[in-house]
Structures are given as structure tokens and as C-alpha cells.
Amino acid sequence: MGYEIKLSRLTELGLFETDLYFTAAFNATEAMRVNRAVEVELINKRAEKARDIAAASSNFADSLFGTIRGGDCCVINGINVSMSFLYNLNYEDFINHARNYFDYLAHIIYLVYLRDKKKIDEIDFGKLIKNRSLIDNAEISDLISTIETNDLFTYISDYNNITKHNHGINTPINTNFRTFEMVGMVFPFSKEIKGVERTHDLALMRDKMKEIHQFVLDSQQAFLKEFDKIYTQEGNEK
């Protein structure tokens, strides 16, 4: 779709309620793009600080040690903040936006393809999966199945669930002290679902963010390609 989805057109189609979710879905993908940029910036800042410490006198280096490990401190509005903390927080935010995107998509699909067949309270992607068989559109039904069975969707759901309800997941920054090259990692984690343990391996954060973001964008484009048939059809009103 090479055009903006307009509220006026959605209203003509009797789909004005979807406007909120189209906006939320777009904002989620944009937020993920920003999270990826922040990840790069934090790594660069951390490497810059490490080079400064290495080049400074021992007194300067010692002055950086306190409640936050030397080389990991940045100042935001006069407050000392750990860059490692921000790095972890940014990744959790990224995953949260990815998971939210699929719930926003579920709302849109429900309102467009399912609402006339079954009333569902508090729709989310999990409930959409359970009611997929009621959707007459084969392409949309296949898209839901494709998302559900993708390992990245499982990763997103498990990471989001664990960090919201159980505990944080470590995201260390590995440093080459000769070159000061730094690489962010995401530690392995597991989630037990109905007696089955799902394990996710150690990952390079930047690569994982790129992979997940592309998965979300591909899912978005696949949906919009099918929705386009409704949006552009003359005289097509629900």
C-alpha cells in the first residue's frame, strides 16, 4: 500500500473503529525503529566512555567509581544513570512494542473479518488464534497461522511474559579492551508452557532486534496487502 490509511475512508467502510489500532500499530513499528537507534547510540557512548577512561589519569578514572561502575555512568537531567540499565530497559521496551503490535493487529483483524461472526471481549492475538477458524478469508487465516508458528513470535511472547511477570533477563555488554569494540548480548532464557519448556539461546542483541523488527514489518505488509482489497474497492462498504 503506497498511501496513507485515512479515517474518512475507514468511516465510509464502516471501519472507523480500526483507525485507533492502525495508528497504534504504526507507532509500535516506529518505536521499534527508535529502540534500534538507541541501542546503537548507547553502545557508542559506552565505548567512548571506555576510551576516555583508558586515556585518562588514574585519578580521573577513580573519580568515576561510585554507586555505578566506572565507564557505565551517564548523566540525564543531572541524574547519574547506568548505561547498562538503560540498555536493558531499551530492549525490554523494544520487545514490548513488538508484542503490542500483534495485539493491535488482532484488534484490526477482529473488527474487519470476525466481528460479524462472534463477539469477543478484550481481544488480543491469543484470542484471535483460538478463533481463526471463524475467519472466511484464507489469506488472513494463513497469516495468523504463519505468525503463531514463527519462532520469533514465540521469542517475543516468552521474553515479554517473563520480564513482566517473573524477572529481568540479563543483557550484558561484552568489551574488547584492546579495540574497545562492544557487543550487546541477550542471555538465554526458558519459559514453561503446559509442561513443555521452551528455551531461547544466547543472542547478539543488535542482530535479534533487526530480525524481530523485520518480522513485524513483514507481517504488517502481508496484512496490508490483503486489507488493500477492501480499502480500495469502489463501493465496498461493510
Can you annotate each of these PLM segments?
Residues 1-96, 104-238:
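Acidic, Ser/Thr/Gly/Pro-rich intrinsically disordered interaction regions
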